[in-house]
Amino acid sequence: MRKFIFVLLTLLLVSPFSFAMKGIIWQPQNRDSQVTDTQWQGLMSQLRLQGFDTLVLQWTRYGDAFTQPEQHALLFKRAAAAQQAGLKLIVGLNADPEFFMHQKQSSAALESYLNRLLAADLQQARLWSAVPGVTPDGWYISAEIDDLNWRSEAARQPLLTWLNNAQRLISDVSAKPVYISSFFAGNM
């Protein structure tokens, strides 16, 4: 457990952006396409005026959502508008709606699953690195790490390998900070 905490803290502290940001998280939904460009630009300007400096897209793919070219185009346009309003942009990568279910697998199956997640994250990072007019200021791994499911050494080892590989390989796509969130429910 100590090694796990050490790796998480190290990942946070090695980033030049490890100081607190005044960010807001956006969980893109298909229904967001109903918001007009003018409304979105106004919202981004208001966020900046209210002191926010960063927009974190929690994901740019969620299961089968945001896989179509027109859905990509909408997210690209929203991201560009945020940056035009003066916000930094942290781009969330792939989110698997079944992430928490897969944590219950055997170590070998878990390792295979985490490798598939990494491949999907890398695909998203490459896609977003090539978008004209959008320059991500960082990457967000959409998986959430809790203090219950990773307690055993058998579960923690694939997780630590995955986190180290994710940070290294995503940074190879674009040398920007890589973020991940964790939550604690008193299970330490």
Language-model features: where?
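Active-site groove signature of glycoside hydrolases
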Residues: 121-154
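Active-site mouth loops of central-metabolism enzymes
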Residues: 25-39, 110-114
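Hydrophobic faces of well-ordered beta-strands that scaffold small-molecule active sites
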Residues: 22-26, 55-57, 89-93, 137, ...
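Short, acidic/polar
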Residues: 33-47, 119-127, 188
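Active-site beta-loop-alpha junctions enriched in small/polar residues
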Residues: 26-32, 60-62, 94-96, 142-146, ...
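N-terminal signal peptide c-region/cleavage motif recognized by signal peptidases
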Residues: 13-15
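Aromatic-lined substrate-binding rim segments of carbohydrate-active enzymes
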Residues: 40-49, 53-99, 155-175
